[in-house]
């Protein structure tokens, strides 16, 4: 019997671009359509595939309950001067948090951002996910990431390679960016409790601050998903990952 894995796809409401210029919004939506098409191809292989739509956030940016309020930038100009917390960062945090809080009765939850695609066949990609689940489960894993791994500044992993290599996988201290990752059911209560008792931040930084070196986290040796080039509503710039 296959484990019951839920995939939650975080998507932006295509009909509500707010004040984002049309050419930039068109870029975001083209990436989103490609991502939806890719994940709908594997949806029937999992216990649940859910699409969670949000309106792109251009209004809410609370300083209360923020882990680092001094870097909040309320400018609505489309510029990015890190370190910064923008409307886009808060919108993404809320979306990831909602997905985690709505984990449900599953063996694992996979959270996928709106622009993520994969190059494998749908069958191969599905198998990689189930293999990763079994690998992590056997090693008391809390989380598993399928994307490219980088590390937060000032972490020990950013100074030297702290990964433990195991064939097709590696154990890591933490991971940025968090665009396609799995949370095991054993971690559900803990991460929901952390969310209830900590301030908000850019989602991958929140994960880094709350999880660095604390629990077993794994990744595929090489990323099996990526985000295509195009406009980002979080970083306000073109990105290739």
Question: Which sequence ranges carry the predicted segments?
Answer:
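An acidic/histidine-cluster motif and surrounding catalytic segment
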Residues: 1-112, 116-241
């Amino acid at each position: 019997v296959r484990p019951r894995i839920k995939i939650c796809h975080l998507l932006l409401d295509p009909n509500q671009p707010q004040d984002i210029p049309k050419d930039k919004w068109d870029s975001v939506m083209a990436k989103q359509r490609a991502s939806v098409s890719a994940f709908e191809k594997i949806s029937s292989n999992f216990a649940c595939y859910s699409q969670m739509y949000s309106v792109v956030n251009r209004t809410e940016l609370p300083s209360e309950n923020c882990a680092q309020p001094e870097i909040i930038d309320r400018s609505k100009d489309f510029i990015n001067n890190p370190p910064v917390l923008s409307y886009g960062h808060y919108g993404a945090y809320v979306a990831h948090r909602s997905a985690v809080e709505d984990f449900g009765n599953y063996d694992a939850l996979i959270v996928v951002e709106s622009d993520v695609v994969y190059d494998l066949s749908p069958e191969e990609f599905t198998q990689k996910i189930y293999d990763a689940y079994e690998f992590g489960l056997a090693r008391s894993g809390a989380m598993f990431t399928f994307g490219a791994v980088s590390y937060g500044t000032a972490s020990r992993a950013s100074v030297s390679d702290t990964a433990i290599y195991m064939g097709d996988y590696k154990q890591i201290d933490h991971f940025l960016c968090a665009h396609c990752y799995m949370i095991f059911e054993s971690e559900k209560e803990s991460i929901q409790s952390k969310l209830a008792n900590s301030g908000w931040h850019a989602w991958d930084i929140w994960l880094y601050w709350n999880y660095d070196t604390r629990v077993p986290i794994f990744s595929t040796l090489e990323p099996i998903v990526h985000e295509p080039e195009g406009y980002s509503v979080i970083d306000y710039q073109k990105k290739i990952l």
